Amino acid sequence: MRVGVFVSGMIVALPLVGASAAEAVKPLIRAHSHNDYMHDRPLLDALDCGFCSVEADIHLVDGKLLVAHDADQCKPENTLERLYLDPLRERAKANGGRIYANGPVVTLLIDLKTGAEDTYAALDKVLERYADIFTEFRGDQVTERAVTALISGNRPVRTMANQDVRYAALDGRPPD
């Protein structure tokens, strides 16, 4: 049996005999799913095509981290945990601690759309609950895990720089 996958203008036939779908996908380290949450199957479409970087824009709304590009598109059921973190954890458990079996670290670009400090404080607490899959930054030590979170958008630069332990890196800019 073969599955056709549309990737950047070409169709690739992937054999599925004797392998799970996740094992049959070749990780594409140069592929990024921008505004990934706009897909019918956020995260899953990107992973099924082998993407190693996905973007989720988040808004802090009533204490929840909701995924949407604009505030008026926020839906209470579209939490960061449900759309991204839980499925990533499931994949990592199924693939021996990686999103793709024996594959590279996957980047989750998290674009903070609401206030930097409040949104990051909420995100930091959530990421800590998923410490088993997220790369850990402790002083000068980096412990790579299945996923590296990369904070963009409204970035709490000083707050993150002053943390002893965190589970996210910072999207750098020229003034940094």
Placement of each model-derived feature along the sequence:
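Catalytic cores of phosphodiester-bond hydrolases, prominently lipid phosphodiesterases
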Residues: 22-28, 34-37, 42-55, 59-176
